[in-house]
Structure formats: structure tokens, C-alpha cells
């Protein structure tokens, strides 16, 4: 895995996957789409769509655990703090040889720099929340969210996907 290349691709994902507008109905549509994809693939994940401070969609598929709920919370907190995907933050820390605790004084009990939380960005408003998945390896969590966003925003996922690890 080439961290520098992945960071470039993630930056392109974050720049491209922007909603023209966003409301509770759109949150439900994106969350329900993620739920159906996960269910069809038989993957046990927790799914969370939220604006900062307000949950709009949550689902826990069969096989997901309370631990996944906590991962969702901590990954979402990371997006709220940095306004970047949790996977990008984790890769940047890996590249720098650090942790959220030693580089940013952020407690691991409240923040997670593992993939799966993606900034919910609205044109002319910026990052207003996050879309988070937990239950797969971090790269797969991240890519599941990107795949769903591409489907909803009319982008070709193959052009924004990370290279296979």
C-alpha cells in the first residue's frame, strides 16, 4: 500500500463527493442504501449518518456488536475534529509515526483514526457531519462509504476507488 497515493485519492474523494444540499430525507436514503448493500453482501456493520450533534440514521446489521457502535462514535468524532475522513487522518499519522494522543492530545477513548468515517460535505456550506461504517477492516469500511456516496451523487466509483490492497 502506497500511503502517499492513498492520501491523494482520499483527498480527491473528499473534494468530489459533495452534496448540493442535504436534509434528513437524504440522510435516510444514503443510510438505507448502505444498509441494503451491507445486508445483500452479508457484512455485519454499524451504519451512522449524522450532522454534527444530530443523528439522522443508524442501523446495526446482524453480527455487528456494541463495539461497532463505539467505533462509529469515535470515528465520527475524528471527522468532526479534523473535517477529514478518519482514514486520511490515520494514514497521515501512520506516515508521521504518531498517534492521535501524541500528535493532537486526543484520547483514544473518544477518537479513532481508523477508516470508516467520511465527511458529509455540502456545497457552499462545507463539512456538516459524517457518514460512518464500522465492522469491516478499516480500508473496506472507508470504501463502502465512498461507494455509497458515489451511487448517490452520480459518480463512477471505479474512478474514485482506492487501489486494491
UniProtKB/Swiss-Prot annotation:
Family annotation (InterPro entries): PduO/GlcC-like, PduO/GlcC-like_sf, YBR137W-like
PANTHER family assigned: PTHR28255, UPF0303 PROTEIN YBR137W
Protein known as: UPF0303 protein Bphyt_1734
Similarity section: Belongs to the UPF0303 family.
Lineage: Bacteria, Pseudomonadati, Pseudomonadota, Betaproteobacteria, Burkholderiales
Highest rank taxon of the organism: Bacteria
Protein species of origin: Paraburkholderia phytofirmans (strain DSM 17436 / LMG 22146 / PsJN)
Signal sequence region: none
Any one Pfam family match given in the protein's UniProt record, by short name: HbpS-like
Amino acid at each position: 500500500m502506497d500511503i502517499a497515493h492513498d492520501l491523494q485519492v482520499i483527498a480527491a474523494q473528499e473534494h468530489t463527493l459533495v452534496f448540493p444540499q442535504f436534509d434528513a430525507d437524504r440522510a435516510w436514503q444514503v443510510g438505507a442504501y448502505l444498509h441494503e448493500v451491507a445486508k445483500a453482501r452479508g457484512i455485519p456493520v454499524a451504519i451512522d449518518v449524522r450532522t454534527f450533534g444530530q443523528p439522522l440514521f443508524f442501523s446495526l446489521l446482524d453480527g455487528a456488536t456494541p463495539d461497532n457502535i463505539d467505533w462509529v462514535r469515535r470515528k465520527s468524532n475524528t471527522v468532526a475534529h479534523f473535517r477529514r475522513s478518519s482514514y486520511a487522518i490515520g494514514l497521515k499519522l501512520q506516515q508521521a509515526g504518531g498517534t492521535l494522543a501524541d500528535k493532537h492530545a486526543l484520547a483514544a477513548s473518544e477518537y479513532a483514526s481508523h477508516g470508516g468515517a467520511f465527511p458529509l460535505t455540502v456545497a457552499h456550506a462545507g463539512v456538516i457531519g459524517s457518514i460512518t461504517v464500522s465492522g469491516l477492516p478499516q480500508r473496506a469500511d472507508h470504501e463502502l462509504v465512498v461507494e455509497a456516496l458515489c451511487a448517490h451523487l452520480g459518480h463512477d466509483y471505479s474512478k474514485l476507488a482506492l487501489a486494491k490492497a
